């Protein structure tokens, strides 16, 4: 069965995490029997610089909000949803390690980062004896293969990077619902 539940602060402006949290609570499953992830970057509706990105304030507050919405004590995986050119990578790596040390997250990763950005995070982590990102969540399907199959090939070996992909059916394009004409009302 399914035991991995992927979430993000931006999905329905946080409402999807509330729904997921209610389901997890209602089901009463042993917490060790499933994996829950969340992602931070885009925020959950706020537009101020401290409500977006990978700065320390936003990452810590977004993690706390995700834990509350999901009604869990920790996240198994916590992703930096996009790279942040406005925040030094050192600040992001330090903050993610702070969240690990606090027991709020077990592992941290990235989503839609380049191999170079991931390696930079690992170099910073190594320099300061911290934990670098352990997984990347790229788009991967028959239309988007280069990053997973070529760009990341070396870092799989170098740092043991794992992946959890998104959009394996290319947002529905690879299903039969798009054979012929596009159905009315689709994106």
What is the meaning of each model-derived region?
Residues 15, 19, 50-58, 84-91, ...:
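Alpha-helix N-cap and loop-to-helix initiation/capping positions
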């Amino acid at each position: 069965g399914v035991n991995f539940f992927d979430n993000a602060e931006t999905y329905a402006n946080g409402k999807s995490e509330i729904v997921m949290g209610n389901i997890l609570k209602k089901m009463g499953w042993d917490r060790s029997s499933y994996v829950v992830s969340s992602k931070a970057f885009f925020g959950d509706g706020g537009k101020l610089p401290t409500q977006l990105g990978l700065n320390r304030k936003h990452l810590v507050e977004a993690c706390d909000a995700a834990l509350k919405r999901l009604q869990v004590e920790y996240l198994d995986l916590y992703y930096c949803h996009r790279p942040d050119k406005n925040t030094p990578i050192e600040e992001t790596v330090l903050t993610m390690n702070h969240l690990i040390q606090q027991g709020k997250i077990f592992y941290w990763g990235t989503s839609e980062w380049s191999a170079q950005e991931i390696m930079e995070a690992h170099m910073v982590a190594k320099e300061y004896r911290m934990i670098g990102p352990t997984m990347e969540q790229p788009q991967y399907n028959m239309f988007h293969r280069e990053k997973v199959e070529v760009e990341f090939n070396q870092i799989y070996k170098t740092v043991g990077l794992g992946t959890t992909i998104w959009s394996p059916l290319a947002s529905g394009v690879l299903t039969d619902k798009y054979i012929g004409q596009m159905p009315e009302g689709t994106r």
